[in-house]
């Protein structure tokens, strides 16, 4: 009893220290104030874990979620401030970077309540899980603001190392070990290729590492059309391609999705793409400014392959998580259209808007997979047959998120794709947009196939998993339903109010 009281006093004292540091940073300012909040949250988690017992576990969720919400609040207060380059040019703060940081923080904030019941049922180590999630979030935020080659390399490595550890969190699962090994090997190879490309940029620009200085250096050395820049472009595209996972750099994606814990997959499926998209826009648009035709062609090829292969292979999948893996490959093909269009025709604004909708659609679907998987122990698509008869809320929520992913009106996914394709059409990407429209129709087929299974009412089609389905008595079930409700609302309502969201996204010039 005395020990528990001492723990509570220690927690309160630690919280006071945290709030005092928060107050100092708030009123004295900081270039990386949102990142500092997460760092304080990480330190606080470690301090409490070293002195607490199992009864204090709710504090871990509270501290993690509070750190993320406070970091989002700090970003919102800093909105529309003048762009600042800090840390000797290594880090840049502007609206464009901050909106991507906001998306990453939003992903993490929704993923933590989605993970609570899974962690309790599987008895995963809660502290390490939250530490890896917050550290990966921190790495993604630094990547969004990176302004030189070294930071662009180090920040994703911070994110990637946490991703490897999270994907292999269930060490006794053979599929998880296989997925982690493949993820680690391909991640290491892609990082090596990325560094190789950066070395060509560094040498060709006369030893510059800041993005804008690289452009100036290429002009001074007259190397902007040299073969070295072509090698740098190809190597950089391959390195970034692994993070974005478009075809043909998608080989790790289905295995990691299937073998990793479902909350981890939900986290990685959105944060990695947001961070990599932010980095890709800056790298391609600034250092490779003089090679715009070449990288446009490369990205068009990746987008076409991703949209075709991702959606066609998704039709044949029997595992829900593998289906979403190939679906995500197709989705990143749509996002690449926005990167190619760029800022001239609202390409970045449409990309950011669609990614916001994709976060809600994807996390809402994964919340359903977590909830259903914990009660049935299966991931097979056919085992979802008749779920509506047992859990109408779960089935209807899943149907709305899947319909939004398919791009059916009047849901958010439809308006997001519509604006993305319209921007591509205005930019003259007629073939690319046509492929996007055709593959979107294909994707509707396999989403509707799942919805048909969910809503079936015939007893002969209802699987034993659904017949024995029982809703969880755990209080933490409310956290999954909370995440799912937020995602469903975000997947439907924003479609009616696109203009304010687009206006905010259009104000992200860098």
Swiss-Prot record:
HAMAP family: NDH1_NuoN_1. It is a multi-pass membrane protein. It comes from Maianthemum racemosum (False Solomon's-seal). NDH is composed of at least 16 different subunits, 5 of which are encoded in the nucleus. Belongs to the complex I subunit 2 family. The chain crosses the membrane at residues 24-44, 59-79, 99-119, 124-144, 149-169, 183-203, 295-315, 323-343, 347-367, 395-415, 418-438. NDH shuttles electrons from NAD(P)H:plastoquinone, via FMN and iron-sulfur (Fe-S) centers, to quinones in the photosynthetic chain and possibly in a chloroplast respiratory chain. The immediate electron acceptor for the enzyme in this species is believed to be plastoquinone. Couples the redox reaction to proton translocation, and thus conserves the redox energy in a proton gradient. It holds the Pfam family Ndh2_N. It is found in: Plastid, Chloroplast thylakoid membrane. It catalyses: a plastoquinone + NADH + (n+1) H(+)(in) = a plastoquinol + NAD(+) + n H(+)(out); a plastoquinone + NADPH + (n+1) H(+)(in) = a plastoquinol + NADP(+) + n H(+)(out). GO terms for cellular component: chloroplast thylakoid membrane. It comes from the Eukaryota. One of its GO terms (biological process) is photosynthesis, light reaction. It is an enzyme of class 7 (translocase). This is NAD(P)H-quinone oxidoreductase subunit 2, chloroplastic. NCBIfam families: NDH_I_N (TIGR01770), PRK02504.1 (NF002701). Keywords: Chloroplast, Membrane, NAD, NADP, Plastid, Plastoquinone, Quinone, Thylakoid, Translocase, Transmembrane, Transmembrane helix, Transport. The keyword Cell membrane does not apply. Its EC number is 7.1.1.-. InterPro entries: NADH-Q_OxRdtase_suN/2, ND/Mrp_TM, Ndh2_N. One of its GO terms (molecular function) is NADH dehydrogenase (ubiquinone) activity. The keyword Transport applies.
């Amino acid at each position: 009893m005395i020990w528990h009281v001492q723990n509570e006093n220690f927690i309160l004292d630690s919280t006071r220290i945290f709030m005092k540091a928060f107050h100092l940073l708030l009123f004295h300012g900081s270039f990386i104030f949102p990142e500092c909040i997460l760092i304080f949250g990480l330190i606080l988690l470690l301090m409490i874990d070293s002195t607490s017992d199992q009864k204090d576990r709710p504090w871990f969720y509270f501290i993690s979620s509070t750190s993320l919400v406070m970091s989002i609040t700090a970003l919102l207060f800093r909105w529309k401030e003048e762009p600042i380059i800090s840390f000797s040019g290594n880090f840049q703060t502007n609206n464009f970077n901050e909106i991507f940081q906001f998306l990453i923080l939003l992903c993490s904030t929704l993923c933590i309540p989605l993970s609570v019941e899974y962690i309790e049922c599987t008895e995963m180590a809660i502290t390490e899980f939250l530490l890896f999630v917050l550290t990966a979030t921190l790495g993604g935020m630094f990547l969004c603001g990176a302004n030189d080659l070294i930071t662009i390399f180090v920040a994703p490595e911070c994110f990637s190392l946490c991703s490897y550890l999270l994907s292999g969190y269930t060490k006794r699962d053979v599929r998880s070990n296989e997925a982690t090994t493949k993820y680690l090997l391909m991640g290491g190879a892609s990082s090596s290729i990325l560094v190789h490309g950066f070395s060509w940029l560094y040498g060709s620009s006369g030893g510059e590492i800041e993005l804008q200085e690289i452009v100036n250096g290429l002009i001074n050395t007259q190397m902007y059309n040299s073969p070295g820049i072509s090698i740098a472009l190809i190597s950089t595209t391959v390195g970034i391609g692994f993070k974005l996972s478009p075809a043909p750099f998608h080989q790790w994606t289905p295995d990691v999705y299937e073998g990793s814990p479902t909350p981890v997959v939900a986290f990685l499926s959105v944060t990695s793409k947001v961070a990599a998209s932010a980095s890709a826009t800056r790298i391609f648009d600034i250092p490779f400014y003089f090679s715009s035709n070449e990288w446009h062609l490369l990205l068009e090829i990746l987008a076409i392959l991703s949209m075709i292969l991702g959606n066609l292979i998704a039709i044949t999948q029997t595992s829900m998580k593998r289906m979403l893996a190939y679906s995500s490959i197709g989705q990143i093909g749509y996002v690449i259209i926005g990167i190619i269009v760029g800022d001239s025709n609202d390409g970045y604004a449409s990309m950011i808007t669609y990614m916001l909708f994709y976060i809600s659609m994807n996390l809402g679907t994964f919340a359903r997979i977590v909830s259903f998987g914990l009660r049935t122990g299966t991931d097979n698509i056919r085992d979802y047959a008749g779920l509506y008869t047992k859990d109408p809320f779960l089935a209807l929520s899943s149907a709305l998120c899947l319909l939004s992913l398919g791009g059916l009106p009047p849901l958010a996914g439809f308006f997001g794709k519509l604006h993305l394709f319209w921007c591509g059409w205005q930019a003259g990407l007629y073939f690319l947009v046509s492929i996007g429209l055709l593959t979107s129709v294909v994707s509707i087929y396999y989403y509707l196939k799942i919805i048909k299974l969910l809503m079936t009412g015939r007893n002969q089609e209802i699987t034993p998993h659904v017949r024995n389905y029982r809703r969880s008595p755990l209080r933490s079930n409310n956290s999954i339903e909370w995440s799912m409700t937020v995602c469903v609302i975000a997947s439907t309502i924003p479609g009616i109010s696109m203009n304010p969201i687009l206006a905010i996204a259009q104000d992200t010039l860098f």
